[in-house]
Amino acid sequence: MSEDPQSWSKERKNCERVKRALMSQSPVIIFLKTALDRLNCNIEAKDISCQPCDAQSTGGYIPGKGIVLCENRLYTKKMAENTIAHEMIHMFDDHRFEVDWNNLRHQACSEIRASSMSGECRWTKELRFGNIKTFRKHHQECVKRRATISVQGNPNCKSKEQAEAIVEEVFNSCFNDFRPFEKIY
């Protein structure tokens, strides 16, 4: 797509505007940016690319390249914030722990952490989308569900059952690792 802002789609213009606002105004994004800076991994708005996507994804982290926001899948500013936070947690993990993204356990751990800490499993969001089946330990169930879906997308994953087993295997240690946060609410 052309880099001339005049030729950008309405979705691209909105994505660019929202991403720039979040990078300078969102407390969680600013906190994660600072944590990444401490790892000598500087990220600016220009390192987050707005692109149209075909899949059901709202974004992605590409090791060594940066973050992609799916301009045609972001419907609210909060959704964009959750997506950027999720991908920044992957970036943090990649730089802090040298994640091997082909290793399903490594990916599952990062997905668990990102789903738990990004806000995408907030109770209010889950309620709005009809995903609340029980109030007890719902956050954990949401994190497991979302991590399983992501691991299933890895070409090295053979089945949903394998993804579920791997997520379950690493869940406790990864779910209880809040770095760079002290805790989650």
Swiss-Prot record:
Belongs to the peptidase M76 family. Keywords: Hydrolase, Membrane, Metal-binding, Metalloprotease, Mitochondrion, Mitochondrion inner membrane, Protease. This is Mitochondrial inner membrane protease atp23. GO terms for cellular component: mitochondrial inner membrane. It is found in: Mitochondrion inner membrane. It is a peripheral membrane protein. Its EC number is 3.4.24.-. A divalent metal cation binds at H86, H90. The gene is atp23. GO terms for molecular function: metal ion binding; metalloendopeptidase activity. The active site is at E87. Pfam families: Peptidase_M76. One of its GO terms (biological process) is mitochondrial proton-transporting ATP synthase complex assembly. The keyword rRNA processing does not apply. Has a dual role in the assembly of mitochondrial ATPase. Acts as a protease that removes N-terminal residues of mitochondrial ATPase CF(0) subunit 6 at the intermembrane space side. Also involved in the correct assembly of the membrane-embedded ATPase CF(0) particle, probably mediating association of subunit 6 with the subunit 9 ring.
